[in-house]
Amino acid sequence: TYNDLYLDLRQRLRKAGVEAAQLEARELICHASGKSQEEFLKDSRLYAPSPVEEQLAVDVQRRLAGEPVAYIIGEWNFYGLPLTVTPAVLIPRPDTEIIAARAIELAKAAGPHGRVLDLCTGSGCIGLAVAKHAENCRVVLGDLSEDALRVCRQNARQNGLTARTTILTVDALQLPTHFLGDFNV
């Protein structure tokens, strides 16, 4: 059953020293099965079809080889936003949500014409969280990596935030080649 798969996988991950074995086992099974967490819980007594078990075996080997679960499943949740993640960007961490919360406060305090700069944006997690929760501001997200910018653009699109964001190539160690304007945050 799905529950048996979960219990076995959780145990394997714990033996391998994975701290968040419970969370990661559930995430990997949901990914392999295409189920939400709610569907996984509801269907826990059902038997998983062979293709799900085969995909799970591949995913588990990747995890046991040290690949982060977020890269295996290709997405991670940050401040209520589902974000695509690839090895081209850092995985959003829960402690970074503290920075996002403060940036949101500052952006809201800046008023309806506030401007926010998210430099070295990677996945765009901080800037996109600001754009989502401080709706009257404009956010400029910049990175030097074109691969990271592709991920950031995809995240802006999938979260419906392209109208309030500008995503561009910026080298944090160089003066900008074009005038970016003033920023409140």
What spans do the regions from the language model cover?
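Histidine kinase transmitter module recognition
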Residues: 16, 32, 88, 158-159, ...
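Conserved SAM/SAH cofactor-binding pocket of Class I
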Residues: 97-185
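Short, solvent-exposed loop/helix junctions and linker helices
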Residues: 3, 15, 22, 49-53, ...
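Amphipathic alpha-helical regulatory segments at dimerization interfaces
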Residues: 11-15, 62, 155
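Non-catalytic accessory regions of SAM-dependent methyltransferases
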Residues: 1-41, 45-48
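Conserved AdoMet
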Residues: 29-105
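A general structural signal for well-ordered alpha-helical segments in protein cores
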Residues: 6, 25-26, 53-56, 69, ...
